[in-house]
């Protein structure tokens, strides 16, 4: 496995032939990232993983400086996953000066995470576009935990005519149901226990959707509480999307009232547009959930079919 910045990448890339897969990361890798690398290996002859903590996607009050950078551990995980080249550029290589030209995420980048973190997705898409240009992959693999990011990258690939196949991997969860995230390392034990309200909310919503339509995306791996049953009484009615959303909120709101978390958003949206699902909606949808627990910003989601 080779490791290097832009010049090393260009030399390595010029010597290679075959299908190249890319897994973009910000480091602090866990088994969810390794699952992305394993999938990229299955789809490609060569795998590149990028490790770059991108300052453009952090807000002024966010944790860019404190963001974990365990590079030696990350390299070991990349090697275990069969990565061929780790692209780990210095900040000055990627941004010799403050970029004047950036990718603008548009309407879909200004809602939900984009509303909570203004400019976040402009920064994400800018660095992803740079990675696509530098690495020239044939396929790229993203996790679906950051589902809004996935939707925007998919749209950018189409709008900017990148000839790249995009693959999304389902959310990888710990045994307790919490979605794997590098930010989970910030959670104190008591906060992690409180954060389990998020997968419980998704499971409650999934139960209501299943009762209302008979089909739904898989749950979040943790037992749903009684709120799903309470909210489910209206699940078979005309406005199933509203009942699904209400079931999730019925799990989250009591925790918020107890001061265990702060709800940032909990909304059911059309998967293709990220617009709210209207009454009687049919088609693929996403339940998007975000909460702040002990000062840590967490996101999760549930795909559903109506």
What role is predicted for each listed range?
Residues 1-219, 226-261, 269, 273, ...:
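Nucleotidyltransferase catalytic core that binds NTPs
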Residues 46, 284-286:
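Structural motif
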Residues 259, 280-283:
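A structural signal for short secondary-structure junctions
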Residues 264-281, 288:
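A conserved acidic, glycine/proline-rich C-terminal tail/linker
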Residues 286-306:
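Generic C-terminus detector
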């Amino acid at each position: 496995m080779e490791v290097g910045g832009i010049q090393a990448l260009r030399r390595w890339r010029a010597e290679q032939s075959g299908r190249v897969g890319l897994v973009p990361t910000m480091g602090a890798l866990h088994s969810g990232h390794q699952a992305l690398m394993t999938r990229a290996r299955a789809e490609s002859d060569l795998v590149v993983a990028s490790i770059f903590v991108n300052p453009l996607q952090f807000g002024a009050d966010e944790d860019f400086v404190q963001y974990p950078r365990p590079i030696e551990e990350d390299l070991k995980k990349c090697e275990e996953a069969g990565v061929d080249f780790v692209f780990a550029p210095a900040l000055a290589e990627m941004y010799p000066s403050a970029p004047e030209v950036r990718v603008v995420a548009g309407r879909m980048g200004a809602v939900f995470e984009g509303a909570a973190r203004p400019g976040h997705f402009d920064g994400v898409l800018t660095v992803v576009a740079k990675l696509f240009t530098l690495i020239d992959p044939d396929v790229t693999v993203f996790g679906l935990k950051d589902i809004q990011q996935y939707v925007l990258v998919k749209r950018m690939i189409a709008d900017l005519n990148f000839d790249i196949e995009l693959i999304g991997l389902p959310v990888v969860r710990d045994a307790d149901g919490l979605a794997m995230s590098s930010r989970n390392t910030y959670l104190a034990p008591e906060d992690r226990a409180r954060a389990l309200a998020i997968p419980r909310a998704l499971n409650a919503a999934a139960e209501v959707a299943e009762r209302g339509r008979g089909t739904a995306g898989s749950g979040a791996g943790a037992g749903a509480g009684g709120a799903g049953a309470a909210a489910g009484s209206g699940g078979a009615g005309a406005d199933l999307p509203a009942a699904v959303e209400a079931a999730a909120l019925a799990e989250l709101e009591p925790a918020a009232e107890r001061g265990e978390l702060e709800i940032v958003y909990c909304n059911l949206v059309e998967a293709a547009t990220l617009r709210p699902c209207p009454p009687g909606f049919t088609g693929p949808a996403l339940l998007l959930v975000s909460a702040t627990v002990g000062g840590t910003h967490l996101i999760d989601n549930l795909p559903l079919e109506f």
